[in-house]
């Protein structure tokens, strides 16, 4: 199984790895698109980048860092991304076998494996990044069907934990998706928004550490339930699971 996580806007700075080498990234079919997007992102003057990326003057260093994407140091992607989901995942305590089951969606790289070395960058899935010819394509238009095709080619069950914006960049037919819901006092259900990432991080950790390999949505549910999580199947869509918290 391959567990695809969402990226995070917040990222760890620095790194001790050599500068980015596209040939050291997984999913080589995405290389050309990655190179084009990176070149366009790196070409943005800082003041223009603030507007394009929708960030404030306070985050000017983020835009400045984008100007040196090919020379900045790298670190494994799973440690580059930070925030609520990644805190709950606690990748530093995961064994190599567990890390091999993890991938991450990305506006810049499409999808990468957890251990792929990447630099710090700023680019979100909702950005309209100018091309050299002045066009303003969406990230969805830039990626086309390439992310979907790359994930289909892994020939494994894909558990897609990406947020909606990143799922739109490359949906995967028959991928298992997860809704997080809480039970209200009156027994009704409410979709969890604030702690959604935290619970998905815990869910991903359980799957990554499983001694069993999941090949179906039912397998995923069984693994999660065995770890003490409350997971339900959707009778109308077997690939959609609900994590009840």
From Swiss-Prot:
GO BP of this protein: response to hydroperoxide
An example Gene Ontology CC term for this record: cytosol
Highest rank taxon of the organism: Bacteria
A Pfam entry, by short name: H2O2_YaaD
PANTHER family for the chain: PEROXIDE STRESS RESISTANCE PROTEIN YAAA, PEROXIDE STRESS RESPONSE PROTEIN YAAA
UniProt record similarity statement: Belongs to the UPF0246 family.
Protein name according to UniProt: UPF0246 protein cgR_1824
Source species of the chain: Corynebacterium glutamicum (strain R)
